[in-house]
A protein has these predicted regions:
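Hydrophobic ligand-binding cavity/cleft-lining segments
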Residues: 1-64, 68-74, 78
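Structured surface interface patches that mediate subunit assembly and partner/cofactor docking
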Residues: 3-14, 45-51, 89-94, 101-102, ...
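Intrinsic-disorder/low-complexity, polar/charged segments enriched in Ser/Thr/Lys/Arg/Asp/Glu/Gln
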Residues: 12-20, 81, 118-120, 129-131
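Beta-strand residues in well-ordered beta-sheet regions across diverse protein folds
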Residues: 29-31, 85, 131-133
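Hydrophobic-ligand binding "helix-grip"
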Residues: 70-127
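Beta-strand/loop substructures that line and gate deep hydrophobic ligand-binding cavities in soluble
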Residues: 104-157, 169
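Terminal transmembrane helical module of multi-pass membrane proteins
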Residues: 158-162
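Short, highly charged C-terminal tails/helix-capping segments
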Residues: 170-177
Length: 177
């Protein structure tokens, strides 16, 4: 079973990317955890636009560590990968989540606001390969329509950020020690 199947087996939207990397899974996983927005200037610009000019936190902080401020770690195995869970109305500026966000795996699994999304993001290191997969579940029909419009606009840019992230991780993983 894939880690994502445990956390979000039902989803309406998804995105996957993968990249060959000449390094061990442990080195690839370590690189994923070190990549920051300073490694990906174009991503910093895209996130700035997404946030309507508001900065995206500390651009020197590793992206995965920064993501923990708005997500919950669902699975984390050193040398293999990490799965993050997010909730909210992503089509709204700031994510739109007015209620408390899940703080634990159990709270994430139990989260069931019909007007909000549940999303999982997986960064997975394997022999010579790094992959990322995002899944989003939107249970409510009206919310799904709103998210679909958002997804149509944001997905190409989200995909570009993921590809740039994978390339930055590859540069770090393949760099001489």
């Amino acid at each position: 079973m894939k880690p994502l199947d445990e956390f979000l087996p039902v989803f309406e939207f998804s995105e996957r990317h993968r990249l060959a990397i000449a390094a061990s899974p442990g080195r690839i996983d370590a690189a994923v955890r070190e990549v920051s927005l300073t490694d990906i200037p174009a991503a910093r610009v895209l996130l700035w636009v997404r946030r309507l000019g508001r900065p995206y936190g500390d651009s020197g902080k590793p992206f995965v560590a920064g993501a923990l401020e708005s997500s919950v770690v669902l699975d984390d195995v050193a040398g293999e990968g990490v799965v993050l869970g997010l909730t909210g109305q992503f089509w709204r500026i700031g994510g739109g989540d007015r209620g408390p966000r899940p703080q634990t795996r159990e709270e994430f699994l139990a989260y069931d606001r019909p007007d909000a999304c549940k999303a999982v993001i997986d960064f997975r290191a394997g022999p010579g390969l790094l992959s990322t997969e995002t899944r989003v579940h939107v249970p409510d029909r009206a919310a799904r329509r709103k998210f679909r419009r958002y997804w149509l606009v944001i997905r190409p840019f989200s995909g570009l950020i993921r590809i740039l992230f994978l390339r930055a991780a590859r540069r770090r993983a393949e760099a001489p020690a």
